């Protein structure tokens, strides 16, 4: 019977979903303890859904995620997506930086097949662990024909999110992942998948960022978080470390103090590409006189996702107007 089932590739990178703790009633645990075989052994019902082809890409907490793993993961995912025997790809990932990895893959993978990222907020040994059901649901979503051509998806806590829109909003709750600007695009309840919306921004097959043309390291882009009484010292340190671009997590509508603004304008004149984002969790950054063609606005991308897009944009051009167009299209 198994040989007649569709095949889903499962790529494991670590995280809480692969974590283990000493006690079911304690919150402390170590990420990336369980290998992919242990994960699959805990969910025998997956074998009734699909043939699971599992591979271990890394086994780390996602706070340690980096470009090296991104490229290794993306290249292997692309190889599997190009294989006619594979119906979709599911990726297990720590939740801390899951939204960044998902958005990176959304911009560089070329396929209409489903790609689903999934994680957990409670480790496998915890009371009411959420990883097993999340993974079961993620595989179910990847098997659903309506999941095709939607870009990279994130499945957590019975919700289906677009990679561009999803963010982590709470440090411990299982319902941490939200799409505050647009909402989830669908739901999945014990494997039953429903869609209500379609991602409209460019992704995957429409993207101009070809994985085959990208090299590590990507252009250096830093994020500077602003606050009351902010001085440009950290910003200057970023410039001194040869950042090609800087994302400003401004207050409110991407605003900064007068002294900081002057430093930003000077850096822009020297060719550093500066994107204004916000430390606020939702809403878009509106352009105005502050920009005057010197800065780029991030639309409604948060600072960490704006950084991913700016890194990729800088592999194509330094032209601010063209990069602004990218932020309005992706």
Swiss-Prot record:
Primary residence: cytoplasm
EC number(s) recorded for this UniProt protein: 3.5.1.1
Listed Gene3D superfamilies: 3.40.50.40, L-asparaginase, N-terminal domain
One annotated GO molecular function: asparaginase activity
Active site feature: 16
UniProt GO BP: asparagine metabolic process
Residues binding substrate: 62, 95-96
UniProt key word Cell membrane: no
Coiled coil: none
Highest taxon, organism lineage: Bacteria
GO cellular component: cytoplasm
First-level EC class: hydrolase
SMART domains: Asparaginase
UniProt catalytic activity: L-asparagine + H2O = L-aspartate + NH4(+)
Family per similarity comment: Belongs to the asparaginase 1 family.
Protein name: Probable L-asparaginase
Name of the gene: ansA
